[in-house]
């Protein structure tokens, strides 16, 4: 059996509770970006070596860790891009809405000009 050497190295730091990793090409771009969704409600994307904020819905997410000894399966738990995301900007998220017991959803198209860049 032939041995294969594998090395791992981190690509980001200080992003807590990642729940989803996806790649997609943003409208108007020519390269794929890596998207990282976090359980607390913030989605980042990495493009050309920079980490940016794609969406921040932390204020709309149910407060995590308030029961069950700090363990929680709620929050932002799903992210999917429409097959034609590059053309129509549609994406879908699954999250636990604050003040409810069930999931919530945003029904808005993505607007590249409204991205909040992280500092």
Model region roles, listed by residue range:
Residues 1-119:
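Acidic, Gly/Ser/Thr-rich repeat motifs that build Ca2+-stabilized beta-propeller blades
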